[in-house]
Amino acid sequence: MTWTVSGLPEGLSYNGRDGIIRGKVMESGEYIVHITAQNLKGKDSNTLTIKVGNDLVLTPVMGWNSWNTFGRSINEQLVLEVADAMVSSGMRDLGYNYVCIDDFWQEEKRGEDGRIKVNKEKFPNGLRYVADYLHERGLHLGVYSDASDKTCGGVCGSYGYEESDAKDMASWGVDLLKYDYCGAPSDRATAIKRYTAMSKALKKTNRSVVFSICEWGGREPWLWAFGKICRARRVE
């Protein structure tokens, strides 16, 4: 099978060896890319629309989250195996390209320096290694934290440490943060304040991290969060 790709905007290139389009587009707009596949049986063509704008994820995030399958048992090897399965099964090529590690990737307590620590028993090579593994396969890494001092599972959350946690996540190559609301006050004003704090911290890192809030809908986040604080939210 041979592939030809034409109409790529400036900044993008197609690698025929692995079939991945890579790069970065600086100009906003919609770009129509023409793709043709050909083998001894014939050929077929289709188009791909690439949307570029100032906002992240102009289309919905699609992918996999570890929680319902593995819960607290998530570990590095499982994540890598899931990533490989998403590629080999064709899910990645259909747009399911986020691999999200939910609760329990972190230690129960912070380090003496106040930094959030990756659980080395579960992720012996660290999250940077996991991110690199995913990125090499055209996938994105998502992680989880909470707008309280503890997550839903009882390990350390990010409240009060938004900037240092965001900085560490960006340095690891994280592409998405799911931000829960367990253990936090129930009023809307506090939710807005805590989610805004992490949103600003992520923007300060200068890395494009999708901020996905998970407050279950009780404070009507569709009125104040989407497009202002976050780019995705939990829908029950």
Segments (PLM) and residue ranges:
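An acidic-aromatic substrate-binding cleft motif
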Residues: K51-E76
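Exposed beta-strand face motif in extracellular beta-rich ectodomains
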Residues: G29-V33
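Low-complexity "stalk/linker" and mucin-like segments enriched in Ser/Thr/Pro/Ala/Gly
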Residues: T2-I20
